[in-house]
């Protein structure tokens, strides 16, 4: 019985080691035009956006140590890829106010409804947890930027 457990343990360790050879790409593509460059927020709003949104929705992802360990590396790379596909704050449509308004409204709705940031993210990133007051401040800013763009008023 002990011999069988030993072989099982060796096989599991070897399998885990082999998994490490298949790490996905963890890249941060070039920032084209950032939301905060196009629509500079006040410092507290900028800090909230960076903490709660930028790891999954920008080219400024902070890759934690566990993003280098399979199978977590696959899950994190998938989540970041999916997040960037839905909304990439590093590729902001500054020259397309109609699209920018849609994205700002989508962000405001997701944050205001508590859909974002995702619970699975905030469990490991306490700085990304938003209080109700912070959610209100953030959605007020997003709604204000949306209204400003709708009215065609520049900064």
Where are these regions (language model features)?
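Electrostatic cytochrome c docking/interface patches
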Residues: 28-49
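Extracytoplasmic/secreted proteins, especially bacterial periplasmic and envelope-associated proteins
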Residues: 44, 48, 71, 75, ...
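C-terminal capping alpha-helices of c-type cytochrome domains
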Residues: 114-115, 122-153
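Hydrophobic membrane-insertion alpha-helices, especially the h-region
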Residues: 6-23
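Extracytoplasmic electron-transfer domains, predominantly the class I c-type cytochrome c fold
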Residues: 74-124
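Acidic helix-start/capping segments at beta-turn-to-alpha-helix junctions
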Residues: 63-78
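A charge-rich, low-complexity, intrinsically flexible signal that marks solvent-exposed coils, linkers
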Residues: 28-32, 86, 111, 149
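The canonical Cys-X-X-Cys-His
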Residues: 49-61, 116, 138
């Amino acid at each position: 019985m002990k011999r069988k457990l030993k072989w099982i343990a060796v096989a599991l360790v070897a399998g885990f080691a082999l998994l490490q050879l298949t790490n996905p790409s963890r890249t941060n593509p070039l920032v084209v035009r950032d939301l905060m460059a196009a629509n500079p927020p006040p410092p507290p709003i900028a800090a909230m956006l960076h903490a709660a949104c930028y790891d999954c929705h920008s080219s400024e992802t902070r890759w934690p140590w566990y993003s280098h360990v399979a199978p977590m590396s696959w899950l994190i790379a998938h989540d970041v890829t999916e997040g960037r596909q839905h909304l990439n704050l590093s590729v902001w449509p500054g020259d397309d106010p109609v699209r920018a308004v849609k994205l700002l409204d989508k962000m405001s709705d997701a944050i205001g409804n508590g859909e974002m940031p995702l619970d699975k993210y905030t469990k490991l990133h306490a700085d990304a947890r938003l209080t109700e007051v912070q959610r209100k401040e953030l959605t007020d800013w997003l709604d204000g930027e949306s209204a400003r763009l709708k009215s065609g008023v520049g900064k």
